[in-house]
Amino acid sequence: MKVRASVKKICSDCKVYKRNGVVRVSCKVKKHKQRQG
């Protein structure tokens, strides 16, 4: 999980979604997992 100020899709499989007001990126490539914070 990377914590970043700016979350972006890294590849076409990445999905951006919001959970409890926190923007997150989920992907089948575990390296691409991100959270805004």
Curated annotation (Swiss-Prot):
Biological process according to GO: translation
Keyword Ribosomal protein: yes
Entry annotated with the keyword Protease: no
GO molecular function: structural constituent of ribosome
Gene Ontology cellular-component terms listed: cytoplasm; ribonucleoprotein complex; ribosome
UniProt keywords, alphabetically: Ribonucleoprotein, Ribosomal protein
Top-level taxon of origin: Bacteria
Coiled coil: none
Pfam families assigned: Ribosomal_L36
Family assignment from sequence similarity: Belongs to the bacterial ribosomal protein bL36 family.
Name assigned to this protein: Large ribosomal subunit protein bL36
